């Protein structure tokens, strides 16, 4: 079995939580496939990209450099599926093989949660709020910079969560 040591996409090393690398055999051809559980930030970065320059380093010190297609796999955890066509599979004899008609398929989601992934890289999302506040608070909010407001709201929410947990909610 082949073990992936590191993955670099377009020159940038990415944190991989779990992976499966295998040869996929179908009626349309043979492909090298790399399924990765990554952070939501990584998925967001590559979700609209069709092709990537990928370097895969294996624990036996082999390195594969290839232009690979990318698909975002839907499911419980953030996943990328990278794949490229293969003409010669001689150098991939020790890779797992999956046939399109097989019932077995690598499951890389077992034993990891979205909470564990977010401890490594927490995504930020823009949010708009409609509030009804006293005018003095509105004026004060308008004078603040976005970075300060982000920090204030993050702190307030975390403090509120702690209070809720201590009350048993």
Give the role of each language-model region.
Residues 1-33:
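Solvent-exposed edge beta-strands and adjacent loop segments
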Residues 2-8, 48-62:
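Short conserved beta-strand and strand-loop elements enriched in small hydrophobics
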Residues 22-31, 70-79, 123:
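Short, ordered beta-strand-loop transition motifs
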Residues 41-48:
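Short, conserved charged micro-motifs
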Residues 57-90:
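Short beta-strand and beta-hairpin "edge-sheet" elements
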Residues 83-112:
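Helix-rich interaction surfaces within compact, conserved domain-sized segments
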Residues 102-135:
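Short Lys/Arg-rich basic patches
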Residues 148-169:
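Short, basic amphipathic alpha-helical segments that act as recognition/interaction helices
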């Amino acid at each position: 079995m082949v073990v992936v040591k590191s993955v670099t996409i377009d020159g940038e090393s990415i944190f991989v939580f779990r992976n499966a690398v295998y040869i996929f055999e179908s009626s349309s051809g043979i492909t090298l496939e790399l399924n990765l559980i990554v952070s939501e930030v990584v998925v967001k970065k590559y979700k609209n990209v069709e092709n990537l320059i990928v370097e895969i380093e294996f624990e036996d010190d082999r390195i594969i450099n290839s232009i690979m297609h990318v698909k975002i796999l839907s499911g419980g955890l953030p996943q990328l599926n990278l794949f490229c066509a293969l003409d010669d599979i001689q150098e991939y004899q020790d890779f797992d093989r999956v046939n399109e008609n097989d019932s077995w398929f690598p499951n890389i989601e077992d034993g990891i949660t979205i909470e564990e992934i977010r401890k490594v890289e927490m995504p930020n999302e823009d949010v708009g709020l409609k509030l009804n506040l006293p005018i003095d608070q509105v004026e004060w909010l308008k004078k603040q910079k976005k970075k300060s407001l982000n920090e204030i709201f993050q702190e307030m929410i975390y403090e509120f969560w702690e209070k809720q947990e201590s009350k048993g909610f």
